[in-house]
Amino acid sequence: MIDLSPLVRRLAGTPLAAWADSLPAELDERLTRSHGDLQRWKAALQALPALTAERIELNGRVSLSGTCHEETRAALRQALLGLSPWRKGPFELFGVLVDTEWRSDWKWQRVAPHLDLRGRRILDVGCGNGYYMWRMLGAGADCVIGIDPNWLFFCQFLALRHYLPELPAWHLPLALEDLPEKLEGFDTVFSMGVLYHRRSPIDHLLALKDCLRPGGELLLETLVVDGDVGTVLVPEDRYAQMRNVWFLPSVAALELWLRRAGFVEVRCVDVAVTSVEEQRATEWMTFQSLPDFLDPTDRGKTVEGLPAPTRAVLLARKP
């Protein structure tokens, strides 16, 4: 489904070369035991019409444009809808607006001013459908590798890559645990919206550090709560209807976790309450979303009576 030979060539002579050499066989093996819906998603990819991106914008937004007749645009729209639900975006593709559940561009506006990604080799952990990977290239990254074991997200990435085949971005259907230990080959590692799903958050931070070269930079974005260095919320059961949320620290506690994991120059650069305008149901994601997960009488609380989602962005460096 994806030719990794350009990635292997690009990483030759780097600390990631041996890992890259192993990836084609690993991807082939994973495809043999993939998701049951993969054939349906493959059919949607095969239905994508042949179009040429004459204008590509990845900096202010993710937008591809070029000659596209109405009949072709309708076929494109139908093929993309076949890859629903779309969580991260939005994307503008030849006149089709993929209005995703999340306004991920709003998060990127909070993150991007604090980073210089020019010439950086980047790993995006839990990359979803790759929206942020394209934005990283727009910010000048040398190459971006995203990992996420979700096969639908992988196919959504391939839909974009269908029209951007030459750009140095690769999505691998892997989890962080599938990577070799002590890779130490990335200049920048992103972990956004992942930490609170981890039963062992310190181990997650240590694994992220293992992926960075000495002096490399981590960008961590996760759910937080108000409080001091000793404050950590552990939901009794669900949080905003999610069962797989384990630890929501205060910013001060999260900074301590990063220092204990061996990071230096730890700093919080943004804290923002997630609004119902930023995360909501759309035609492209028709299931329940944030408005359904908040107390209808008090949007400062979830339906479980816990603090509503607030997200912090932290930067840290590996010594």
UniProtKB/Swiss-Prot annotation:
It catalyses: carboxy-S-adenosyl-L-methionine + 5-hydroxyuridine(34) in tRNA = 5-carboxymethoxyuridine(34) in tRNA + S-adenosyl-L-homocysteine + H(+). GO terms for biological process: tRNA wobble uridine modification. Its EC number is 2.5.1.-. Carboxy-S-adenosyl-L-methionine binds at K88, W102, K107, G126, L176, E177, M192, Y196, R311. SUPFAM superfamilies: S-adenosyl-L-methionine-dependent methyltransferases (SSF53335). InterPro entries: CmoB, Mo5U34_MeTrfas-like, SAM-dependent_MTases_sf. Keywords: Transferase, tRNA processing. Gene3D superfamilies: Vaccinia Virus protein VP39. GO terms for molecular function: methyltransferase activity; transferase activity, transferring alkyl or aryl (other than methyl) groups. Catalyzes carboxymethyl transfer from carboxy-S-adenosyl-L-methionine (Cx-SAM) to 5-hydroxyuridine (ho5U) to form 5-carboxymethoxyuridine (cmo5U) at position 34 in tRNAs. Homotetramer. Belongs to the class I-like SAM-binding methyltransferase superfamily. CmoB family. This is tRNA U34 carboxymethyltransferase. It comes from Azotobacter vinelandii (strain DJ / ATCC BAA-1303). The gene is cmoB.
